[in-house]
C-alpha cells in the first residue's frame, strides 16, 4: 500500500520536473491581458445595464 503511494509521488515529482513553466514575464503579460479583458467586460456590462435600466424606466 505505502509502496504504491510512494511510487505515485515519485512519478508526480518526475512529471512536474518535465513541465515547461512560464517565465515571470509571460505570467505578468498574461495577468495584464486578463485584467484588461475583465475591465473592458465590466465597462460593457455596466453600459448595457445602464441602457436597459433607462429603457425599462421609460416603460413604467
UniProtKB/Swiss-Prot annotation:
Taxonomically, the superkingdom here is Bacteria
Q: Which residues lie on this side of the membrane: Extracellular?
A: 53-60
Q: Where in the cell is it found?
A: Cell inner membrane
Cytoplasmic side of membrane: 1-31
Any Gene Ontology CC annotation: plasma membrane
Task: Provide the GO MF annotations for this entry.
Answer: protein transmembrane transporter activity
Topology in the lipid bilayer: Single-pass membrane protein
Looking up PROSITE patterns in the UniProt record yields: SECE_SEC61G
Q: What broad class describes the main subcellular location of this protein? A: membrane
Glycoprotein recorded as keyword: no
Q: Which GO terms describe its biological process?
A: intracellular protein transmembrane transport; protein secretion; protein targeting; protein transport by the Sec complex
Name the InterPro entries on file. SecE_bac, SecE_sf, Translocase_SecE/Sec61-g
Q: Name one Pfam family in it.
A: SecE
The transmembrane segments are 32-52
How does this polypeptide assemble, per the annotation? Component of the Sec protein translocase complex. Heterotrimer consisting of SecY, SecE and SecG subunits. The heterotrimers can form oligomers, although 1 heterotrimer is thought to be able to translocate proteins. Interacts with SecDF, and other proteins may be involved. The channel interacts with SecA via subunit SecY.
Q: What's the stated role of this polypeptide?
A: Essential subunit of the protein translocation channel SecYEG. Clamps together the 2 halves of SecY. May contact the channel plug during translocation.
Q: Which family does it belong to?
A: Belongs to the SecE/SEC61-gamma family.
| Protein name per UniProt | Protein translocase subunit SecE
- Gene for this protein? secE
Amino acid at each position: 500500500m505505502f509502496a504504491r503511494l510512494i511510487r505515485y509521488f515519485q512519478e508526480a515529482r518526475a512529471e512536474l520536473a518535465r513541465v515547461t513553466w512560464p517565465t515571470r514575464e509571460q505570467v505578468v503579460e498574461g495577468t495584464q491581458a486578463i485584467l484588461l479583458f475583465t475591465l473592458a467586460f465590466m465597462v460593457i456590462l455596466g453600459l448595457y445595464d445602464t441602457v436597459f435600466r433607462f429603457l425599462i424606466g421609460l416603460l413604467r
